Amino acid sequence: PKYTGKIRYAGVSVAFLALLFVAIPVTTNVAQNTNVVASYYSNIAQGYDDYGFVYSFSSTVVDRGMKKPEDYNKQNVEDVEQKVNSQKQITTVDGKSGPNIICVLLESFCDPDEINFLQVNEDPIPTFHELEKNYSSGYLNVPVVGAGTANTEFEMLTGLSMQYFGTGEYPYKTILKQTDCESIASDLSKIGYATHVVHNNGGNFYSRTNAFSKMGFDTFTSKELMNITEYTPNGSWPTDDILVSEAMKTFDATPDQSDFTYIITVGTHGDYPKEPVIENPTYTVSGVEDEGMKNAWTYYVNQLNEADRFIKELTDELSKRDEDTIVVMFGDHLPTMGLQNSDMKSGDIYKTKYITWNNMGLPKEDADLYAYQLLAQTTDTVGIHEGTIMNYHQTQMNSTDEASYQDGLDLLQYDILYGKRYCYNGTDLYPASDLVMGIDKVDITNVSDSSTGDTVYIYGHNFTNWSKVYINDSKVASTYLSACLLYTSPSPRDKRQSR
C-alpha cells in the first residue's frame, strides 16, 4: 500500500548529522593510529588530493598538538636532562665576545644541479656553489614540500620537530598563540646577544609577529617598516636586495652587543608564471617538454640568480666589517613545481641544501642535517652551548641509537609545549619578549594644514608606503610622499573630532 501522509525528515537528518559528527573524528583517529593514513601533511593541498576532503578536513580540525608520550613523567624527563648535562660543554663566549650569527632562509631555493631532468645554459647560482665548495655545507631534511615555510622555520628556530604535530598543523597558529617557546633567540639572549628578524613580506603572515615574540626575539623588521621600491618581474614580491641594508641596521643598532639576525627572503616565492615574463632571459632551460612548465622553470632559475646575487652582496658587505661573523643559509622547501623523488639526485623531495660562510677561519665540516639540528650545529662550531633543546641536539644528534634520540626529543618537546615543564623545574624560563617592530624609530615631528585647509601634512621620520594615519583612533585615507612626509584629506567629521 502507498503511504499518502507527510514524511518528517528533520529528525532523521539531525540524527544522521550527529552520527557523522561523532563517527568521522573517531574514524580519523583510528585510521591515523593504525597508519592507514598519514597523520602529518608536508603539503596540505597534496594531502587533500591524496586523502580527500572529508578525512583531510576532519584531521586538520581534530588532530592538533602533540600526543602525550606514554613514558612521559618527571623522572624520565630528568633522566634525559641528566644524560645531556653529563655530556654538554661550557659556553666559551658571551654577548660581547661571541660572533655575530646570521641565519638566512632562502625561499623555495633549490640547486638546479639537483634536478635530474633540468639543464640550464649556464650556472645561475655561482656564489652558492663557491660557498658550498669552500665552507661547511650539506643536505637539509625539511618537513614540508612546495609550501609551509613557517614549519621549516619553526623547526630551525626552536630545534623542535614537526613530526609530532597534527595533520597540516602550523604551530605558529596553534600552540604558540598562547604558549611561549624556547628558541635560538631566547637561548642567545641569555648570554647577552641581541636578536632580530628581517623579512621583506608582511609581518602578520603566518602570525609571525606573535610567534617571534613568543620565541623571545627583540626586534622584527617586516616590509611595513621598509621603503620597498623594487619588485620581482611578476610583480608579486619585493626583491631581496633590500634585506642587506636592513640586516646591517641590526648590527649598527647594537654596537656593544653580538647579534643573531634571522633573514627571510621572498624573491623566489611561487607561483611561477607559465607565460613568458622576462624579456630575453639570461638563463634558459631545456629538458622540459611542456611549454608552460618551461616558462615557469625559466622564470624560476632567473630568480635563483637574483637570490645568488643577494648572497654575494650580503657576504661582500659582511667581509667589510671588522666583526667575527658566521652565516648559515638554507632552502626552506623545494619550489611548487610538482617534483617527485625520482626527479631529484638526492632521491628525496624533502631534502634541500644549506651552505655557510664565515670570516673566522673555521674548518669545513660537511654534514647532512635535519632542519631542527641546523642551529645546534652552527652554535656548536663557535663555542655556544645554551638551551635545553639546542644542548640536547649537540650532545645526542650523533648517537647511534636513533630511536632513543627521537624518544628523548619527543619527551622534551612535549614537556616544554604541553607538559609540566619538568626540564625547567616547573618555571617559565623563557617568557615572551616585548617585540619591537623595526630598528628605525618612526615619529611625527610636525602636523600642518594646507592653505585651503582641506589637506593635512604629517612630517616625521621613517615613514613607508605602508604607514597609516589615524585621527582619534580611526584610520583615515592617507598618501605617502616620502620617508619624511605623509598627507591626508580628513573629512569634516574627522576634523571636528581632532579639535
Spans of features found by a protein language model:
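N-terminal secretory/membrane-targeting segments
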Residues: P1-P99, Q119-Y139, T174-Q178, E182, ...
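Solvent-exposed soluble domains appended to multi-pass membrane proteins
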Residues: Q89-K96, C103-L106, D111-A483
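Conserved small/polar residues in nucleotide/adenosyl-binding loops
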Residues: Y487-D494
